[in-house]
Swiss-Prot record:
Identification of the protein by name: Vacuolar protein-sorting-associated protein 25
A GO CC annotation given for this chain: ESCRT II complex
Entry's Gene Ontology molecular function annotations: protein homodimerization activity; structural molecule activity
Gene deletion effect: Vps25 mutant cells exhibit multivesicular body sorting defects, with large amounts of ubiquitinated proteins detected on endosomes. This leads to activation of signals (through Notch and Dpp receptors) that drive cell proliferation, non-autonomous overgrowth, loss of epithelial organization, and render cells sensitive to apoptosis. Vps25 mutant cells display accumulation of autophagosomes. Bicoid mRNA is mislocalized in developing eggs.
Amino acid sequence: MAEFQWPWEYTFPPFFTLQPHEETRQQQLKVWTDLFLKYLRHTNRFTLSIGDQNSPLFHNEALKRRLSPELVLAILGELERSGHANPLDKRRQEWQVYWFTLEEYGNMVYDWVQETGQTNTICTLYEIASGENTSHLDFYGVDEAVLLSALRLLEEKGRCELIEMDGSHGVKFF
């Protein structure tokens, strides 16, 4: 895996402090949300813990700067508003983060199903997320919990039906 390319802002000490000026803060949060999504995709991660203060995402060792939990929550709040994250606990300490929104994941999967003629067939979540037929697609490698959430949205729209057997999930597309 290639080394992650940090944006120039990552080497700018004030970037690690929540900015008081509204316009500056909004720009700062936009850069941070983009950085979170790119970094998590690069590292193939879908969950974040606010307590993970040693992650390079939260801590620039060279600058000796670290994101405050307040700033991390502000960033995750922005990701939540844009449909790219959801808290996994009531204390909002553990988060599931999506490289694409759940709706985008659902649409990508449904487009693939239609393009490959798999309507009215049953697929396993493994086939969709990790199968050789999807290795070239943006949703390849998606976390099963994220995929399941995206498929639930498709199910609400009547495009599929989730099937659970012995703790495993399958899905039939319409």
